[in-house]
Amino acid sequence: MERIIHGDVLSPILAYMRLKGQHKVILESIPRDKETARFSILAYNPVFEIKFENGVLYQNGQAIDRDPLDFLYEVTHKNQHHSDLPFGGGAIGFVGYDMISLYEEIGQIPEDTIGTPDLHFFVYESYMVFDHKKEKIHVIEDALYSGRSQEDLEKALNQVLEELRIPAPNEFEDLDLSPLDFKPHIAPQKFEEMVETARDLIRNGDMFQCVLSQRFSAEVTGNPFDFYRNLRVTNPSNYLYFYDFGDYQIIGASPESLVSVKNGIVTTNPIAGTRPRGATDEEDKALATDLLSDEKETAEHRMLVDLGRNDIGRISETASVQVTKYMEVELFRYVMHLTSVVKGRLLPELTAMDALKATLPAGTVSGAPKIRAMRRIYELETEKRGVYAGAIGYLSATGDMDFAIAIRTMILKNQTAYVQAGAGIVYDSIAQNEYQETINKAKSMTRIGELRP
């Protein structure tokens, strides 16, 4: 059951604040002048929960002996017809970086210092889709998973519409924020030693590239959703998200798609090569020119585009794989990156989950060759990555999906905020520069508690 209302009277943020539903999640994309930023999704009151934790898969708390990703697809996919809307009900959540250990031998997982599941999704049939191009809001109540009657659907829809009319108590209050004093979990010297170890392995022919990361944490007070509201203004990005999982929240502004499937077309978006933003347009242009002429950065990008082509090629029809955008400079709030786009047509016998398995984790957060690099990451890094560098997004009941790489992402748990950032190590990397790159990438999240113009 669907009701369409005018999109000029209600924003996704205001709708989130007014709705009383449980486990609300918001997915956005800014700036909205891009076609890819046409839609925002707000989902609430999930029908059930799927979680993989400590090696056990659970559905609503009941243990299930199944492959987690296959099970997720089976319970979510409902052969819904495709529409212009990106989401037709389904699962929203994340697959952690370390899930790959179920499918590949990559060694002993480091210590888990945060304690989030390896996979966590809620499955929704109550949601809103904001079409910013047509200025329409689709308010939807479905019975895909619950089998609710038409009477129950109408009652639920009217309840949502009534809640949307009533102002939230804190609509006009200042954001409840506090500056966060982030501390690195390892010393700069230790990270630089990790870089040199990786370079030695690369020089000896063990691998071509390895993406090493470091974690930062801070005590946090304030309203988690207000941190998201600040983030979307201070660091607009291709993938913006706020997830409330109950005992922890995830806030993110990822610039990079891991993989999407839409009407059988599978797409990935390699991003590699970084410079800080300049203070002026002229400085931006100079830095972009420098980035494009940097042999180390462009070689790294070419390597990861090739890796993306290989990943997509394994699940796509012969000769359908194309690089539709190649090594273009894209500007973000604090940094600029080299970006490319790789597309292919998914083999008819495969599903979106096959595409996710083929691409997780991205080469841009692991390295090349991918399996070898992941083994070295486990040997060099001291903490389990968890959400960081995994996949975060949705799997629609239509069989389509869209997952970002979980970078520029913050975990809030037990009054602590966690942020992680990495750098791609290659043969001629300079350890101090790679350390500084992780600092530059983390800035968008470590400054999330600061109100800035």
Language-model-derived ranges and their functions:
Residues 1-453:
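Extended alpha-helical targeting/anchoring segments
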